[in-house]
């Protein structure tokens, strides 16, 4: 059964990643109304008779979201049953399921009633939490903690501050990026790093949305760089923290490069999807570090208790 659960966890993680990228594809191609205002039917039909490209994209996104719902539900039930001895299992299972349902309902509401771009931007963030929760659940199932000796990890307050701070802030950056997509502001500023050679400062809403995201992205790049330097200096003996921050910096660097290329490739589809891919992976890594941070306090108390007993 454990082998089956491992396969299920991997397939579920991949399916949720496809859901995230599919949502970005729907937004990028303007396929949100590919099935009209019908939900769960498509243009009022179970199998649509007229298949335009927008209909195929929207319908594919609905199908992958539906399969993800089934897989996540099954994974939550089995992990709850067979891995309940691991402290975070129940919490992650609940988060995975609740946020997947929330993003499905929000997607359905957007189709039937429509939503403002500021509200639609939350949709990606909700999906991202479900994806990260399933990734963490998968890590627990594969016992990644034991391989990195993460269960005995103790971090100082400074490192935990950076972990929690960067993760929360990354969610804000994700929202600003999703808002750029939904406001159709990807090409509002044709130059980089400033908005335009003729007008360095933004003058209208779409330009402010674009430049706001750029500033937020630059700040998270600098913050992760600083945290990585701290990890390299002080956590070489803790490989999970050491490599966690190095991987985070690699991902945020790739994210920044692709973000710049989005501007200079006229917002090409491949660059837009890579942009969504890298931020999804980065958020999952940061959430894993958050989980380690919550354990650190427990580990410190246990170490102090053992120390008192030995005295």
Swiss-Prot record:
Membrane-spanning parts: 7-27, 63-83, 92-112, 122-142, 160-180, 212-232, 244-264, 272-292
Source organism: Bacillus cereus (strain AH187)
Superkingdom as given in the UniProt entry: Bacteria
PANTHER family on file: HEME A SYNTHASE
Subunit structure: Interacts with CtaB.
Catalytic activity: Fe(II)-heme o + 2 A + H2O = Fe(II)-heme a + 2 AH2
Recorded topology in the membrane: Multi-pass membrane protein
Name of the protein in question: Heme A synthase
